[in-house]
Protein backbone atom coordinates (compact mmCIF):
# COMPACT_ATOMS: atom_id res chain seq x y z
CA UNK A 1 0.00 0.00 0.00
CA UNK A 2 1.42 3.41 -0.97
CA UNK A 3 1.68 6.25 1.53
CA UNK A 4 -1.14 8.04 -0.31
CA UNK A 5 -3.43 4.99 -0.14
CA UNK A 6 -2.61 4.59 3.55
CA UNK A 7 -3.31 8.22 4.51
CA UNK A 8 -6.43 8.37 2.31
CA UNK A 9 -7.94 5.26 3.95
CA UNK A 10 -7.01 6.42 7.46
CA UNK A 11 -8.51 9.86 6.78
CA UNK A 12 -11.92 8.36 5.95
CA UNK A 13 -11.71 6.06 8.97
CA UNK A 14 -10.76 8.80 11.47
CA UNK A 15 -12.78 11.75 10.14
CA UNK A 16 -15.76 9.97 8.56
CA UNK A 17 -15.52 11.63 5.15
CA UNK A 18 -13.02 11.43 2.23
CA UNK A 19 -9.92 13.63 1.91
CA UNK A 20 -10.08 16.11 -0.98
CA UNK A 21 -6.36 16.73 -1.47
CA UNK A 22 -3.10 14.79 -1.22
CA UNK A 23 0.27 16.53 -0.80
CA UNK A 24 3.83 15.17 -0.76
CA UNK A 25 7.16 16.75 0.17
CA UNK A 26 10.46 14.86 -0.25
CA UNK A 27 13.50 14.28 1.91
CA UNK A 28 16.89 15.16 0.47
CA UNK A 29 20.55 14.28 0.27
CA UNK A 30 23.36 16.77 -0.23
CA UNK A 31 25.69 15.68 -3.04
CA UNK A 32 28.42 18.19 -2.17
CA UNK A 33 28.79 21.43 -0.19
CA UNK A 34 29.18 20.55 3.49
CA UNK A 35 29.22 23.14 6.30
CA UNK A 36 29.08 25.82 3.60
CA UNK A 37 25.45 26.83 4.21
CA UNK A 38 25.98 28.89 7.38
CA UNK A 39 29.02 30.50 5.73
CA UNK A 40 26.71 31.98 3.05
CA UNK A 41 28.11 29.52 0.52
CA UNK A 42 26.86 26.98 -2.02
CA UNK A 43 25.26 23.54 -1.64
CA UNK A 44 24.21 20.95 -4.23
CA UNK A 45 21.41 18.73 -2.87
CA UNK A 46 18.75 16.69 -4.65
CA UNK A 47 15.30 15.69 -3.45
CA UNK A 48 14.86 11.91 -3.05
CA UNK A 49 11.95 9.53 -3.57
CA UNK A 50 11.29 9.18 0.15
CA UNK A 51 8.68 11.65 1.32
CA UNK A 52 6.04 12.87 3.74
CA UNK A 53 2.48 12.47 2.41
CA UNK A 54 -0.56 14.28 3.83
CA UNK A 55 -4.20 13.58 2.97
CA UNK A 56 -6.24 16.62 3.88
CA UNK A 57 -9.43 18.66 3.51
CA UNK A 58 -10.66 22.13 4.45
CA UNK A 59 -12.92 22.59 7.46
CA UNK A 60 -15.76 25.10 7.82
CA UNK A 61 -14.39 26.33 11.15
CA UNK A 62 -10.99 27.49 12.45
CA UNK A 63 -9.81 24.21 13.98
CA UNK A 64 -6.89 22.08 12.82
CA UNK A 65 -7.11 18.33 13.51
CA UNK A 66 -4.13 16.07 12.83
CA UNK A 67 -3.55 12.31 12.88
CA UNK A 68 0.03 10.96 12.80
CA UNK A 69 -0.14 7.53 11.17
CA UNK A 70 3.50 6.76 12.02
CA UNK A 71 3.00 7.43 15.74
CA UNK A 72 0.25 4.90 16.49
CA UNK A 73 -2.35 7.29 15.05
CA UNK A 74 -1.72 9.88 17.77
CA UNK A 75 -3.88 12.97 17.34
CA UNK A 76 -3.55 16.69 17.89
CA UNK A 77 -6.14 19.45 17.70
CA UNK A 78 -5.77 23.21 18.06
CA UNK A 79 -7.57 26.43 17.13
CA UNK A 80 -6.38 29.18 14.81
CA UNK A 81 -8.17 31.71 17.04
CA UNK A 82 -6.07 30.95 20.12
CA UNK A 83 -2.31 31.34 20.65
CA UNK A 84 -0.57 28.24 19.25
CA UNK A 85 1.66 26.84 21.99
CA UNK A 86 4.14 23.95 22.01
CA UNK A 87 2.80 20.48 22.80
CA UNK A 88 4.29 19.07 26.00
CA UNK A 89 4.53 15.42 25.06
CA UNK A 90 4.21 14.98 21.26
CA UNK A 91 7.29 16.33 19.50
CA UNK A 92 5.83 15.62 16.03
CA UNK A 93 2.93 17.95 16.87
CA UNK A 94 5.31 20.87 17.31
CA UNK A 95 6.47 20.70 13.69
CA UNK A 96 2.84 21.00 12.56
CA UNK A 97 1.92 23.68 15.10
CA UNK A 98 5.08 25.68 14.40
CA UNK A 99 4.49 25.72 10.64
CA UNK A 100 0.85 26.79 11.07
CA UNK A 101 1.74 29.49 13.61
CA UNK A 102 4.41 31.02 11.35
CA UNK A 103 2.14 30.68 8.32
CA UNK A 104 -0.48 32.79 10.13
CA UNK A 105 2.11 35.54 10.56
CA UNK A 106 2.83 35.47 6.82
CA UNK A 107 -0.75 35.19 5.55
CA UNK A 108 -3.59 34.97 8.09
CA UNK A 109 -6.19 34.35 5.36
CA UNK A 110 -6.76 30.65 5.91
CA UNK A 111 -9.11 28.50 7.97
CA UNK A 112 -9.10 25.08 9.57
CA UNK A 113 -8.20 21.71 8.09
CA UNK A 114 -8.14 17.99 8.82
CA UNK A 115 -4.81 16.24 8.11
CA UNK A 116 -3.54 12.66 8.16
CA UNK A 117 0.26 12.42 7.92
CA UNK A 118 2.60 9.55 7.07
CA UNK A 119 6.16 9.39 5.76
CA UNK A 120 8.97 7.06 4.78
CA UNK A 121 11.96 9.40 5.06
CA UNK A 122 14.29 7.51 7.44
CA UNK A 123 14.46 9.42 10.73
CA UNK A 124 17.79 10.24 12.31
CA UNK A 125 19.69 9.43 9.11
CA UNK A 126 20.28 13.06 8.14
CA UNK A 127 17.88 12.87 5.18
CA UNK A 128 15.68 15.72 6.45
CA UNK A 129 12.50 14.02 7.60
CA UNK A 130 11.69 17.14 9.66
CA UNK A 131 12.08 19.57 6.73
CA UNK A 132 9.97 17.25 4.59
CA UNK A 133 7.19 17.41 7.21
CA UNK A 134 7.41 21.20 7.57
CA UNK A 135 7.25 21.79 3.82
CA UNK A 136 4.39 19.29 3.41
CA UNK A 137 2.28 21.04 6.08
CA UNK A 138 2.96 24.47 4.58
CA UNK A 139 2.06 23.19 1.11
CA UNK A 140 -1.23 21.76 2.45
CA UNK A 141 -2.48 25.19 3.52
CA UNK A 142 -1.07 26.84 0.40
CA UNK A 143 -3.14 24.48 -1.79
CA UNK A 144 -6.31 24.26 0.31
CA UNK A 145 -6.60 28.04 0.67
CA UNK A 146 -4.79 29.21 -2.52
CA UNK A 147 -2.29 31.25 -0.50
CA UNK A 148 -0.06 33.51 -2.58
CA UNK A 149 3.18 32.03 -1.21
CA UNK A 150 5.84 30.51 -3.45
CA UNK A 151 8.02 27.50 -2.70
CA UNK A 152 10.86 29.59 -1.28
CA UNK A 153 8.46 31.27 1.18
CA UNK A 154 7.06 27.88 2.23
CA UNK A 155 10.67 26.76 2.81
CA UNK A 156 11.57 29.86 4.85
CA UNK A 157 8.39 29.37 6.87
CA UNK A 158 9.46 25.81 7.69
CA UNK A 159 12.94 26.93 8.70
CA UNK A 160 11.49 29.63 10.97
CA UNK A 161 9.19 27.08 12.59
CA UNK A 162 12.10 24.72 13.26
CA UNK A 163 14.40 27.47 14.57
CA UNK A 164 11.93 29.44 16.67
CA UNK A 165 9.11 27.04 17.60
CA UNK A 166 10.77 23.59 17.70
CA UNK A 167 14.07 25.12 18.84
CA UNK A 168 16.52 23.51 16.41
CA UNK A 169 19.08 25.74 14.68
CA UNK A 170 19.05 24.55 11.04
CA UNK A 171 20.07 26.26 7.80
CA UNK A 172 17.71 26.80 4.85
CA UNK A 173 18.99 24.07 2.49
CA UNK A 174 16.77 21.21 3.70
CA UNK A 175 13.48 23.06 3.36
CA UNK A 176 14.46 24.75 0.10
CA UNK A 177 15.31 21.51 -1.73
CA UNK A 178 12.15 19.83 -0.37
CA UNK A 179 10.04 22.71 -1.70
CA UNK A 180 11.86 23.33 -5.00
CA UNK A 181 13.41 19.99 -6.01
CA UNK A 182 13.10 18.93 -9.63
CA UNK A 183 12.81 15.39 -10.99
CA UNK A 184 16.10 14.05 -12.42
CA UNK A 185 17.95 17.18 -11.27
CA UNK A 186 20.10 18.40 -8.41
CA UNK A 187 19.72 22.01 -7.24
CA UNK A 188 22.65 24.41 -6.85
CA UNK A 189 21.61 26.72 -4.02
CA UNK A 190 23.27 30.02 -3.15
CA UNK A 191 22.68 30.16 0.60
CA UNK A 192 23.12 33.95 0.67
CA UNK A 193 20.68 35.02 -2.06
CA UNK A 194 18.59 31.80 -1.92
CA UNK A 195 18.95 31.73 -5.70
CA UNK A 196 18.66 28.25 -7.19
CA UNK A 197 19.75 26.61 -10.43
CA UNK A 198 18.47 23.19 -11.54
CA UNK A 199 21.34 20.93 -12.62
CA UNK A 200 20.45 17.88 -14.78
CA UNK A 201 21.69 14.54 -13.43
CA UNK A 202 23.39 12.18 -15.90
CA UNK A 203 21.19 9.36 -17.21
CA UNK A 204 21.74 5.88 -15.78
CA UNK A 205 23.24 7.10 -12.50
CA UNK A 206 21.74 6.08 -9.15
CA UNK A 207 21.95 8.16 -5.98
CA UNK A 208 23.00 5.65 -3.33
CA UNK A 209 22.78 6.57 0.36
CA UNK A 210 24.34 4.30 2.96
CA UNK A 211 23.65 4.92 6.64
CA UNK A 212 26.67 3.95 8.76
CA UNK A 213 24.30 3.48 11.73
CA UNK A 214 27.13 4.76 13.90
CA UNK A 215 25.46 6.53 16.81
CA UNK A 216 26.34 10.21 16.63
CA UNK A 217 27.27 11.71 20.00
CA UNK A 218 29.45 14.76 19.35
CA UNK A 219 27.37 16.24 16.59
CA UNK A 220 25.68 19.08 18.58
CA UNK A 221 28.66 20.43 20.50
CA UNK A 222 31.15 19.94 17.68
CA UNK A 223 28.80 21.55 15.14
CA UNK A 224 28.61 24.68 17.29
CA UNK A 225 32.40 24.69 17.71
CA UNK A 226 32.87 24.51 13.92
CA UNK A 227 30.47 27.42 13.42
CA UNK A 228 32.38 29.50 15.97
CA UNK A 229 35.71 28.67 14.30
CA UNK A 230 34.31 29.76 10.92
CA UNK A 231 33.02 33.01 12.44
CA UNK A 232 36.45 33.61 13.98
CA UNK A 233 37.96 33.14 10.52
CA UNK A 234 35.51 35.58 8.92
CA UNK A 235 36.29 38.19 11.61
CA UNK A 236 40.03 37.80 10.97
CA UNK A 237 39.37 38.83 7.35
CA UNK A 238 36.87 41.50 8.52
CA UNK A 239 34.16 39.91 6.37
CA UNK A 240 30.54 39.08 7.14
CA UNK A 241 31.06 35.46 6.10
CA UNK A 242 33.76 33.19 4.66
CA UNK A 243 31.90 33.36 1.34
CA UNK A 244 33.59 36.74 0.87
CA UNK A 245 37.17 35.48 1.34
CA UNK A 246 39.14 34.25 -1.69
CA UNK A 247 41.57 31.33 -1.58
CA UNK A 248 44.39 33.68 -2.64
CA UNK A 249 43.61 36.04 0.26
CA UNK A 250 43.61 33.09 2.63
CA UNK A 251 46.86 31.57 1.34
CA UNK A 252 48.67 34.90 1.71
CA UNK A 253 48.01 35.11 5.47
CA UNK A 254 47.10 31.55 6.52
CA UNK A 255 50.26 31.33 8.66
CA UNK A 256 48.96 34.22 10.83
CA UNK A 257 45.77 32.34 11.75
CA UNK A 258 45.39 29.88 14.60
CA UNK A 259 46.32 26.54 12.92
CA UNK A 260 42.97 24.88 13.74
CA UNK A 261 40.95 27.88 12.51
CA UNK A 262 43.09 27.95 9.34
CA UNK A 263 42.17 24.33 8.59
CA UNK A 264 38.46 25.05 9.09
CA UNK A 265 38.60 28.11 6.83
CA UNK A 266 40.49 26.21 4.13
CA UNK A 267 37.77 23.54 4.08
CA UNK A 268 34.98 26.09 3.60
CA UNK A 269 36.79 28.03 0.86
CA UNK A 270 37.79 24.95 -1.12
CA UNK A 271 34.38 23.29 -0.60
CA UNK A 272 32.57 26.32 -2.02
CA UNK A 273 34.77 26.21 -5.12
CA UNK A 274 34.25 22.44 -5.44
CA UNK A 275 30.47 22.78 -5.18
CA UNK A 276 30.22 25.34 -7.99
CA UNK A 277 32.52 23.22 -10.17
CA UNK A 278 30.54 20.06 -9.31
CA UNK A 279 27.33 21.62 -10.65
CA UNK A 280 29.14 22.26 -13.93
CA UNK A 281 30.61 18.73 -14.05
CA UNK A 282 27.20 17.13 -13.42
CA UNK A 283 25.51 19.27 -16.07
CA UNK A 284 28.14 18.11 -18.59
CA UNK A 285 27.73 14.48 -17.52
CA UNK A 286 31.38 14.37 -16.43
CA UNK A 287 31.13 11.73 -13.69
CA UNK A 288 34.90 11.27 -13.53
CA UNK A 289 35.40 14.92 -12.51
CA UNK A 290 32.40 14.76 -10.18
CA UNK A 291 33.98 11.74 -8.50
CA UNK A 292 37.28 13.59 -8.04
CA UNK A 293 35.49 16.56 -6.48
CA UNK A 294 33.53 14.30 -4.11
CA UNK A 295 36.79 12.57 -3.09
CA UNK A 296 38.45 15.95 -2.45
CA UNK A 297 35.41 17.02 -0.42
CA UNK A 298 35.61 13.91 1.74
CA UNK A 299 39.36 14.31 2.31
CA UNK A 300 38.80 17.95 3.30
CA UNK A 301 36.05 16.98 5.78
CA UNK A 302 38.33 14.30 7.20
CA UNK A 303 41.60 16.24 7.41
CA UNK A 304 40.73 19.97 7.56
CA UNK A 305 37.25 20.09 9.09
CA UNK A 306 37.80 16.86 11.08
CA UNK A 307 34.18 15.70 11.14
CA UNK A 308 34.39 12.14 9.83
CA UNK A 309 34.70 8.96 11.91
CA UNK A 310 36.49 5.67 11.04
CA UNK A 311 33.18 3.93 10.23
CA UNK A 312 32.32 6.57 7.61
CA UNK A 313 35.83 6.52 6.15
CA UNK A 314 35.53 2.72 5.87
CA UNK A 315 32.25 2.97 3.93
CA UNK A 316 33.76 5.52 1.54
CA UNK A 317 36.78 3.27 0.98
CA UNK A 318 34.62 0.19 0.24
CA UNK A 319 32.39 2.02 -2.27
CA UNK A 320 35.36 3.72 -3.96
CA UNK A 321 37.09 0.36 -4.43
CA UNK A 322 34.14 -0.79 -6.57
CA UNK A 323 33.29 2.33 -8.58
CA UNK A 324 36.81 3.66 -9.22
CA UNK A 325 36.55 6.72 -11.48
CA UNK A 326 33.07 5.83 -12.76
CA UNK A 327 31.29 7.76 -9.97
CA UNK A 328 31.83 9.47 -6.63
CA UNK A 329 31.37 8.92 -2.90
CA UNK A 330 31.71 11.09 0.21
CA UNK A 331 30.27 11.62 3.66
CA UNK A 332 27.13 13.74 3.63
CA UNK A 333 25.57 15.72 6.47
CA UNK A 334 26.85 17.33 9.66
CA UNK A 335 29.42 14.68 10.48
CA UNK A 336 30.46 12.32 13.30
CA UNK A 337 28.46 9.45 11.81
CA UNK A 338 25.37 9.52 9.62
CA UNK A 339 25.47 8.67 5.93
CA UNK A 340 27.64 8.56 2.85
CA UNK A 341 26.25 9.51 -0.55
CA UNK A 342 27.47 7.93 -3.77
CA UNK A 343 26.75 8.56 -7.44
CA UNK A 344 26.91 5.08 -8.94
CA UNK A 345 26.24 3.84 -12.49
CA UNK A 346 23.05 1.75 -12.21
CA UNK A 347 24.85 -1.34 -13.53
CA UNK A 348 27.31 -1.19 -10.61
CA UNK A 349 24.74 -0.78 -7.80
CA UNK A 350 24.44 -4.55 -7.07
CA UNK A 351 28.23 -4.86 -6.90
CA UNK A 352 28.50 -1.87 -4.54
CA UNK A 353 25.78 -3.29 -2.31
CA UNK A 354 27.44 -6.72 -2.23
CA UNK A 355 30.83 -5.22 -1.32
CA UNK A 356 29.34 -3.12 1.48
CA UNK A 357 27.36 -6.08 2.85
CA UNK A 358 30.45 -8.30 2.76
CA UNK A 359 32.91 -5.85 4.31
CA UNK A 360 31.37 -3.05 6.40
CA UNK A 361 29.94 -5.05 9.30
CA UNK A 362 32.96 -7.36 9.30
CA UNK A 363 35.27 -4.35 9.69
CA UNK A 364 33.20 -2.18 12.06
CA UNK A 365 30.79 -4.47 13.92
CA UNK A 366 27.84 -2.34 12.72
CA UNK A 367 25.19 -3.24 10.13
CA UNK A 368 24.60 -0.52 7.53
CA UNK A 369 21.33 0.50 5.85
CA UNK A 370 21.40 0.84 2.05
CA UNK A 371 19.07 3.12 0.04
CA UNK A 372 18.92 3.49 -3.74
CA UNK A 373 17.22 6.79 -4.63
CA UNK A 374 16.10 8.79 -7.63
CA UNK A 375 16.34 12.60 -7.81
CA UNK A 376 12.71 13.61 -7.36
CA UNK A 377 10.18 16.41 -7.67
CA UNK A 378 9.75 18.93 -4.86
CA UNK A 379 6.58 19.46 -2.83
CA UNK A 380 3.16 19.45 -4.49
CA UNK A 381 0.02 17.47 -5.23
CA UNK A 382 0.35 13.71 -5.44
UniProtKB/Swiss-Prot annotation:
SUPFAM superfamilies: GHMP Kinase, C-terminal domain (SSF55060), Ribosomal protein S5 domain 2-like (SSF54211)
Catalytic activity: alpha-D-galactose + ATP = alpha-D-galactose 1-phosphate + ADP + H(+)
Record-listed Mg(2+) binding positions: 130, 162
UniProt subcellular location: Cytoplasm
Keyword Manganese assigned: no
UniProt EC number: 2.7.1.6
Pathway given in the UniProt record: Carbohydrate metabolism; galactose metabolism
Alphabetic keyword roster: ATP-binding, Carbohydrate metabolism, Cytoplasm, Galactose metabolism, Kinase, Magnesium, Metal-binding, Nucleotide-binding, Transferase
TM region(s), chain numbering: none
Sites where the protein binds ATP: 124-130
Gene3D superfamilies: 3.30.230.10, GHMP kinase, C-terminal domain
BP-aspect Gene Ontology terms: galactose metabolic process
Keyword Transferase among record annotations: yes
UniProt site positions, description: Transition state stabilizer: 28
A GO term from the CC aspect: cytosol
HAMAP family: Galactokinase (MF_00246)
Family the UniProt entry places it in: Belongs to the GHMP kinase family. GalK subfamily.
NCBIfam families xref list: gal_kin, PRK05101.1
UniProt name for this protein: Galactokinase
Amino acid sequence: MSLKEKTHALFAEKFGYPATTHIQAPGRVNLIGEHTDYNDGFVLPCAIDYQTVISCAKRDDRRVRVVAADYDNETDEFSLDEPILTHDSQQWSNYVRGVVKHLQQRDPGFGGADLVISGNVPQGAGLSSSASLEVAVGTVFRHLYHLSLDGAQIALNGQEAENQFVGCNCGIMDQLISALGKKDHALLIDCRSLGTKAVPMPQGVAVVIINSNFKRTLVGSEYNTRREQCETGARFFTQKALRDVSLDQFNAVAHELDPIVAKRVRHVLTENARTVEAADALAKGNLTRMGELMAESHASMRDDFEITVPQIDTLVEIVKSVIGDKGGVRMTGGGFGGCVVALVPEALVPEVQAAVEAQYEARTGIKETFYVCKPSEGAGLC
